[in-house]
A protein has these predicted regions:
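Short beta-strand and adjacent tight-turn residues that come in two discontinuous sequence segments
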Residues: 69, 88-89, 108
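C-terminal lobe and pocket-closing loops
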Residues: 18, 93-157
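Residue-level signature of catalytic and energy-coupling elements of molecular machines
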Residues: 23, 79, 123
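Short helices/loops that flank or line small-molecule/ion binding pockets
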Residues: 27, 52, 73-87, 92-102
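Short, well-ordered secondary-structure micro-motifs
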Residues: 48-49, 76-77, 117-121
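Hinge/capping helix and adjacent helix->loop/strand transition within the periplasmic-binding protein
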Residues: 1-74, 135-157
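Structured helix-beta-strand junction loops
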Residues: 5, 30-33, 82-83, 100-102, ...
Length: 157
């Protein structure tokens, strides 16, 4: 693991939900009706995050309406066009739209607040017992020489 990226729970600027707890309360009442989108396939981090969030707040993940998009490039227009109620992805996917005022981040999923979103609470600060980060790393092909392995380890440490 080289780094880890916090996830973010994001709504369009005109969403009625002002904080994560308001969203969760509405989601509990209608998990199928409040669709969540993510920029990865089922089983990927953007899918796992809302499923774990659902479980953490007492929603059966099987009841969640998840819409899979092929990356943030498809997720953002769906969110901005109100095709989904909220999005779940790495916080970096949304920074430009946050700065433009097009979306609001209700919570980040790391243990600590994210410097780029210092006014946004973590899930734990909001009373939700969940921490979720996406690890980033480097892989090498099978059979890499010890010499090449050492070069890469030195480069990243």
């Amino acid at each position: 693991k080289l780094i880890e990226e916090a996830g973010a729970i994001v709504v369009p600027k005109d969403s009625p939900y002002q904080d994560i707890n308001q969203l969760v309360e509405a989601w509990k009442k209608d998990p199928k009706g409040l669709a969540v989108g993510g920029g990865s396939s089922p089983g990927g981090p953007d899918h796992l995050l809302p499923m774990q969030l659902a479980q953490a707040v007492g929603i059966d993940p099987k009841a969640v309406s998840f819409v899979s998009y092929d990356g943030g490039g498809e997720l953002l227009p769906a969110l901005l066009g109100s095709k989904i109620a909220f999005g779940a992805s790495g916080f970096g996917e949304f920074l430009d739209q946050v700065e433009a005022g097009d979306v609001r981040v209700l919570a980040v999923t790391s243990a600590e607040r994210v410097d780029a979103l210092k006014d946004v609470p973590t899930l734990k600060e909001s009373g939700i017992d969940l921490e979720f980060t996406n690890w980033r790393g480097v892989v090498a092909p099978p059979g890499i020489s010890e010499e090449d392995k050492a070069v890469w380890i030195d480069a990243f440490t």
